[in-house]
Each structure stands twice: as structure tokens, then as C-alpha cells.
Amino acid sequence: MTRKNTTTNPWAKFHGPNLGYVIEQYDLYVTGAGSVDPELQELFEIFGAPSFQDDVVTGDNTATHFSPQNTGNIEKILKVVQLVEQIRSFGHTLAHINPMEDAANGQSLLEKAMNELSDADLKAIPAKTVWQDAPEGIHTALDVIHRLKDVYTKSLAYEFSHIQDSEERTWLHQMVESNSLRQPLSNKKRTALLKRLTAVEGFEQFLHKTFVGQKRFSIEGVDMLVPVLDEIVLEGAKNGVEDVMIGMAHRGRLSVLAHVLEKPYSHMFAEFKHAKIEGAVANSGWTGDVKYHLGREQVVSNEEVSTRVTLANNPSHLEFVNPVVEGFARAAQENRKKSGLPDQDISKSFVILVHGDAAFPGQGIVSETLNLSRLNAYQTGGTIHVIANNAVGFTTDSYDSRSTKYSSDLAKGFDIPIVHVNADDPEACLAAANLAIQYRMLFKKDFLIDLIGYRRYGHNEMDDPAVTQPQVYKKIKNHPTVRAIYADQLQAAGVLNADEVETITQFTQEQLKSDYAQVPPADTSDATIHVKVPDVVAKGIQPIDTGVEIDSLRAINEGLLSWPEGFNVYPKVKKILERRKDALEENGKIEWALAESLAFASILQEGTPIRLTGQDSQRGTFAHRHIVLHDTDTNETYSPLHRLPNINASFSVHNSPLSEAAVVGYEYGYNVFAPETLVMWEAQYGDFSNTAQALFDQYVSAGRAKWGQKSGLVLLLPHGYEGQGPEHSSARPERFLQLAAENNWTVANLTSAAQYFHILRRQASILGTEAVRPLVLMTPKSLLRHPLTLSTASQLSEGRFQPALEQENLGTKPNKVKRLVLSTGKMAIDLAAEIESGKHEYNLDEVHVVRIEQLYPFPAEKVQSIIKRFKNLEEIIWVQEEPRNMGAWHYMAPILFELAGDKVKTGYIGRPDRSSPSGGDPFAHKAEQELIVAHALDVKYNFRQDKQEIEVFSN
């Protein structure tokens, strides 16, 4: 029996979907059709049917008491609740977000739900029954539906239902459903917005008419991109952001440069005209780049606030700038002037990435970069993504470029809120921008704006888009610009009259003409096919003493082998570390990993921060580094490099995600923005680095020549043929050597721990100077602990890096030497092992071996001085483990030919040309390697006559 209590109403706390559930449960309770939760059953027994004293207003302005039990409206209430949630979740399918379409084409789901409810049904249900936070003036469910349709199905459309965090979801819905997001703009701001659109349109049209046929990749059709960026930058500045980093491709870039980054029109025109004007291409390198690839840095001020805006230099490789700019932001956020990990302040900077609608789902680098967004080593506190969506990629329609409804759908998998907005509705676009920046500042996470417009012209201005999209371009031809649409709206609202609109247009035109008049005639007087590399780059890295006193090294080593009391180091690791205890004593030997740690510590003590990332970099792929220790009982971590004395620079080492391209781009960007930091990326195996080839090609090797963008990034690429097959043998040194020119980077393949120590310290010493350049290191695998690569303390404390080393105990009888063998890396160690084994019958008086430690720039003077000692030299041989069409041979061949002169022959010993880097049979590999070594050291062996496929001679 129901014991109805009328003094309190527990149902008041139930709203929306929760209320629908309670009503449904009461129906089951009354009919006995199913089991009801005991707690709810008790509530029903005490309080009866769910009922609400609410504001369904009657004719005499009194509130009626609404009870589902009395009206039989349970089913209808449930349908309304479901409809409300469907509008929130799927309203975007009804929204008018595409200016080239009259209406949305995905209406069936919501239409079906709405057709099941009459207006009378909706009027009978109180608003707060289905919407707890219904604003003032919303009384009935009908009002609710009208209001929510107005919010979710107009020029703005939202996708929030995939967001996992309920707090974020609630905040987002409250923001868009309240009046706070779309407060009417003041007349002053509306006029300013029209002026901005007039400037954007006027600039593009001026270029179109003045520089006919020249590529500019017009913004027209998504003109609102500029005001959207303006708004985000301004709101960021108001929140105290010091740096805003922008990454974008070429579409609309010139307009963004001219307006958001305030690049003078005269400078833009000078680049089109090939005229000399001071500062026109201020950030260009010696080879330069096309105008729509160049970046800019500018302090932007507005409304008494300012911030530095950086538009990153960018190649036409779409989206590859994304991780680079994220690296910029992280570097700007971190304080590296203390020991331990750097301090990150995510309020200092944020990133805006402008994507293309075809590139966002099409380029894998996008998802790789999105995956970095929540990772401790890479997160930057939230990126604002803007898809400049013109619904076509070159000539490819969207149905051929993606498998999803929206170009933004990829972002759903990363829990990113999405707003679609019609680019022909300027005020809606600004509302989207405001929501984006508020969300980023509050939740420190990514946000995406899908700015849907069109492309007024072809992919470039010489292209006729009507050839492939004839129907849509008929529409576009007759479609008014967003400036014209907004001008009409302001006139209709009485904000401006026609004369005032015309005055704004004329002012823009006069400004453009005036700036164009400042540009002198074209000047090709200095045009030349010979590009002059700056002297400081051309002369290369000068010799630098990089030794560290033995006492300092011993003190460092002691610190490296200590950890907090009670910290339980894994026994196997502890044993490895304890072996290093006496490494710096008189008879001690220093292996590769210890030399690295000693180099790191000494670099830190000199005030240079270090950042090292890569797959498995904390331990090291080959279980050699152990720079981060794990407590066996608590899994807490500890790095001795964080506790060493006399350090005032940060050290961070992170295991990266299973990505090469995004991580390389990120580390490159970090180093560009933190030039004082030794930034290192380590491949798990060098073989896998080629998935970042675009970054090596477009940024690391060429960034300074194209853009004047300096980097000292270090690439650690494990390399060496050990019979492990084609995926675990080669870092493809031939590719880095092919890209080597103009002293753009250093490529090395070292053979001792001391050499590694010195080259790291040399690299640290050139950071922040004009001599800086990237360092590409082919690092060892089996050589990490090889006896012939170990070094002594004196080798670390004295001298410097040597670009070439002579094999000890050879060449002692110069007049007898007939063959000079050059090799590098593991091949050189294999030769040394054979020489020192004493198990051969070669006449080693006739052979001398030189290890080329630094492949590029080639140490020609050093090698030439060695050659001059051997008056009876007959041949110079290059020996390598890679196939002939790989490795260093094709780089070395012309160098050897020049060194040899007319009287000395040159030759190659190694594997023949092959399509795969390495065979898969370790026994075959071993046999080949032994044959290469034997033939290289046996002067009597006439390999020019031999038909075996193990070596090839080339004169």
C-alpha cells in the first residue's frame, strides 16, 4: 500500500534522461510488469508518482501541478527526453553549416522523432521536466525544442556526445545553450569585423588583378579564417599567453601573414614583383623558398594586450608542420634553467593548427600528432585546430578523399570537441573561436573548429576548377562573398549605411594602391645560378677541445652510481652499473653507455639543458643506457642525472610513442625554439627512421638553407650489419649522405666510446652559435660493449673529436704500404678484430687502415696527409658492409678518386648491388662478412679478376 508523503518532493532533483528513467520505473512499479530497484520502490511507496510543481503557465498565469500518473504522459515524456538528447547529439545533421548547400541532408533521424510528438503534447510538459537549466522565458517542452533547435541546427553545429568526461560535456552544453556564447556584438565590433573582411577580400582581389596567373593559394571562400585567428590570438593575449604558435599550409597563408602577423602589404607585393625592399624576406636562408612557405614572428597588440605570434615556416608537405609547432610550444612553456626535469607552464603558449579538409583525414602525421596531445613528454596544454574546409582537395571531391561524413571525424577518437560553422556567418565563426579558446584555457585540451566554406578559384590561380567540379563552380561564380553578405546584414540592422560600407571598401583599396606604389621596379641584377653559403657555415665546425678533467669525470661517475637510500634497483641493472665503478681508474675501460652518461653530466654542468626522446630511450633498446632506474618494490623512477652537484640546467629523457615522423618533427621544433638545448632523438633501430623521411628532407637537412632556421638536433640511429635481417641492420646512411651539402649537417659513424663522448660535447658547444648544425650519428648495437670500442679515462680527459682515426700498429713501414683501406663504423671494427686476432697470413706491412669517423663533412685534409706518407701506394679501397648501391660508397667514390690522383687506383670491396638492405640468413651474412674482411686485408688477392659476388671494383 502506498504511504504517500506530501511534505517533500524528492522528484525535484530528477531531470532530463534521469527523470525519464524514474518515470519508466514508476510505470513498471504500477503495472507490475517488471522488477524495480528496491530503493526506487521504497520512494514510490512513500511519495507516490513522480510529480512536479513547475511553470506550465495557464491562462490566469498560475502554475499547474503536472503529474505523469494523472495525465498518462509517461511515454510522451520519455519521447521528449529522447528528442532533447537527440537534438544535442545529432542536431548537426540538420544544421545549415555548408554555404554551398541550401539545407542539411541528414534529417531523417530527428524528423522521425519530432513527427511522433504534436505541439499540444509538447506544450503540456513543463520545460524543467526535460531541461533542468532551461533559461528564463522557456516554459514548456515546445519552447525547449524550439530553443535547442535554434542552438544546434543553425549556422553552428556541435559534436560533444563523444566526449568522455561528463564535466566537460556538461560545460560545453551549458555554454552553447546559454546566452553567454552568442552575446550580440557591439556595433563597434561588428564594424571592425566588416573592415577586417574587407581588407582580406581586397588584398586577395588586388593580388588577383595585379599579379595575374601567379600562385597565391587564395583564402577566398574561407575568408573568416583571418578573423577567427584574430579572435583566438586576442583572447589568448587577454589570458596572459606570451606566445601563440601557428602551423598551416599554403592555402590562405599570404592573407594570414598580411593580416594576423601584420606583414606589410609592400613586402608582400615586393615578393610577387621580385623587387628589393628592406625586410621583405627577412627570414629567408641562402637558397630561400616560395613566398607561401615562409613564416614570420610578430608581436601583435590589440585592446591594450599583446602577445608574440609565430607562423612556422612550412613546406608543401601538408600537415608535417603540426608536430614541429607543438615542439615550438613545449619549448616556450618550459624553464630549463635548473637541475632535474624542466618546469612546464602551459599558460605561456598554445598552438593553433590550420588544417585542410582533405589533408586532415588523409595524412597520417595528423593522427600521430594528435596522439601526442595527452602524453607527458609532449602535451602542450591543448591545441586549437581549425579545418579551413573548402570541400575539395585540388580536384578531388570529399567523397573520394575520406570515408567519414565530416573531415573532422578523426578528432572524435582523441576526445576532442568539434564545432562545425558556416564560414558565411561571421558572428557564428567568432562564437566558435571564443568557445575554443575558453575550453582550451579551462580544460587544457584540444578543440576543433570545422570552418566550412568553399574555394572561389582553383587549387592555384592557374587552374580551372570548373573542369572537374562544373556544377559547384556555377554556384560559386554567382555566390556573394562573406564580406558582401555581412555588409548587407549590417545595413539591414541599421549599423551602417551603404555610403559607410563603400567608404570602408575605398579606404582598403587606397591603402593597397599606396603600399604598392612604395615597391620599386623588379630587380634581377643579382640573379645568379650560384648560391653563396654564409662563410660561417661554409668553413664548418672548427676544432674544439672537449676533454674533461679526470677528477671531474670520477666525481660524476660516483654520482651516476648512487641513488637514494631505500631505493631498490633491479639486481641485474645494479650489477651492470656496479661494473662501471672502476671504469675511470688506471686500468679501467669505459663502454659506450658510460661515455654517454659522462658526456651528458659534463654538458649539464656547463649549463646546457638536454632533452632525449625515443622508443625505449630511458633504458636503451639494447639494455645499455639505464639512465632512468625503477624501484623494484614501488616502481618509482630515479635518474642520477637529476641529483648531480653543480648543475643548473634541466635533463629530460622520455620514452616516445611508437611514432617516428611526429616525434622527429616535435624534437626538431623544440630545438628550433630552444636553441641552447641539446635535443636528441633516438630511433629504436635506424631502419625505422625512414618513416620520418619527409622531416629529414624538408626540415632537418634543408631548413636553414630555405628559411634561415637553425637547428642542432641530434639523430641517434642504431646501425650495423649483424645478420639480423633487412629491418634491423641499416639506418640508410646513403640517404643522409645524399642530402649532405653546404655543411648542412654532420654525418658520423663512430668506433669508440671516447669519440662518442667528444662529438656529443662538441655538438653541445656549438648550440646557439652560427656554427650550429644537426648531427646524424649511426650508433652501434653489438659494438656497445665490444672490447675494441672501449676507451680509457685519459681518452676522455684529453683532446677532442677526431674525424678520422688510423688503425694502431699498421703503416709503420710507409714505403711498403701498397693499399690504403678506408671504412667506417662496425666495418672498421671487424677489420680491426681480424688484424688483432693474429689468425691470418696477410702481409699487413702492405696495408694501412683508416677509420672515417666523420663521413660528412669528409676530413679530406687529414686523409690526404696520411696518403702523402705512403710513397709507393697503389690503391685506395673503400670497404663497407652495406650493398654497393647503399651505404657510403656512392658518396665516397668521387672523393677517393680526387684523393688518389692519376697514379693511384681506387676500388670498392663489399656486397654487390641489392634491392634489400640485408639478407635474412645470419650464417650467410657471417660468411659474406668474413670474405669482405679477408679480401680487404689481402693485398695479393686480385679482386679485379674475381667473379664472386662479394665485391665489386670500380676505378
UniProtKB/Swiss-Prot annotation:
Entry's Gene Ontology BP terms: glycolytic process; tricarboxylic acid cycle
Top EC class, one word: oxidoreductase
Any Pfam family matching the protein: OxoGdeHyase_C
Record-linked InterPro entries: 2oxoglutarate_DH_E1 (IPR011603), 2oxoglutarate_DH_E1_bac (IPR023784), DH_E1 (IPR001017), KGD_C_sf (IPR042179), ODO-1/KGD_C (IPR031717), THDP-binding (IPR029061), Transketolase-like_Pyr-bd (IPR005475)
SMART domains on file: Transket_pyr (SM00861)
Signal peptide feature range: none
Source domain of life: Bacteria
EC numbers for this chain: 1.2.4.2
GO-annotated molecular function: oxoglutarate dehydrogenase (succinyl-transferring) activity; thiamine pyrophosphate binding
GO cellular component labels: cytosol; oxoglutarate dehydrogenase complex
This protein's UniProt keywords: Glycolysis, Oxidoreductase, Thiamine pyrophosphate
Needed co-factor(s): thiamine diphosphate
Sections of the chain in a coiled coil: none
Catalytic activity from the UniProt record: N(6)-[(R)-lipoyl]-L-lysyl-[protein] + 2-oxoglutarate + H(+) = N(6)-[(R)-S(8)-succinyldihydrolipoyl]-L-lysyl-[protein] + CO2
Function comment: E1 component of the 2-oxoglutarate dehydrogenase (OGDH) complex which catalyzes the decarboxylation of 2-oxoglutarate, the first step in the conversion of 2-oxoglutarate to succinyl-CoA and CO(2).
Subunit-structure text: Homodimer. Part of the 2-oxoglutarate dehydrogenase (OGDH) complex composed of E1 (2-oxoglutarate dehydrogenase), E2 (dihydrolipoamide succinyltransferase) and E3 (dihydrolipoamide dehydrogenase); the complex contains multiple copies of the three enzymatic components (E1, E2 and E3).
Similarity section: Belongs to the alpha-ketoglutarate dehydrogenase family.
Name under which the protein is recorded: 2-oxoglutarate dehydrogenase E1 component
Lineage: Bacteria, Bacillati, Bacillota, Bacilli, Bacillales
